[in-house]
Amino acid sequence: MTDRVRAVVFDFDGVILESADVKTEAFVELYAEHGAAVVERVRAHHLANLGISRFKKFAWIAEHVLGRPLGDADSAALGERFAALALEKVLAAPFVPGAEAALAVLARAGLPRFVASGTPQDELALIVDRRGLRPVFHEVHGTPREKPEILRDVMARHELAPDQVL
């Protein structure tokens, strides 16, 4: 593996921590006041778009499920409510089985480890710091940048070709 791969980029929720279900439940709770039919559409959209920024999901839900545009202030308020619902549960989430061992093996092999996540950057940094994971990763990146942009940036700055990144 180390002959060809020179770096590994991870998603975070559901890859490092068992936090994907926490976020699904936060979406459900956020839209519960709109009734079961709306909640099921929200859940389905969220699950079909894991790893995508929650703010993009909020805008899609407002337009396609609730039938109205979503202003910046409303989007920010939803983001704050979502974080309040999910943050403590994410901080308490267990590691995905095998994640800690895989990270340790990669560290021993000297392979740089990065995170590219759909979680907002400030929130992701807080989670990584509070879980003591900062030393595990060379860099941690979240939204508003999207994953393809993050990957291009990491590869350019670290002089990595696409076939050298897992």
Residue ranges with predicted function:
Residues 4, 84-115, 121-125, 148-149:
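Short, acidic loop-to-helix structural element flanking the phosphoryl-transfer center
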